[in-house]
């Protein structure tokens, strides 16, 4: 059975380690198409299982959280990331320290 685009995205997001973040573009590339960054946003907004698909670990390429975070807004996303030990500098995730280092094949 072939996976849908959203299923591919969810499988990648499930792999983001506790205490780390990934970018929309990074998730898109790992899911099979580097141009899917906006689609990643749509998929995360439609997340069917937020307890097992940690969409709050996905941030933009500068390390900013989404004001449109579907499950409580940007403040909730920041709260969840801080609970995992992710640090923010002037409202941005320190990407050098917390970005998931997953090779893109």
Residue ranges and their predicted role:
Residues 1-105:
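Nucleic acid-binding interface residues in structured DNA/RNA-binding domains
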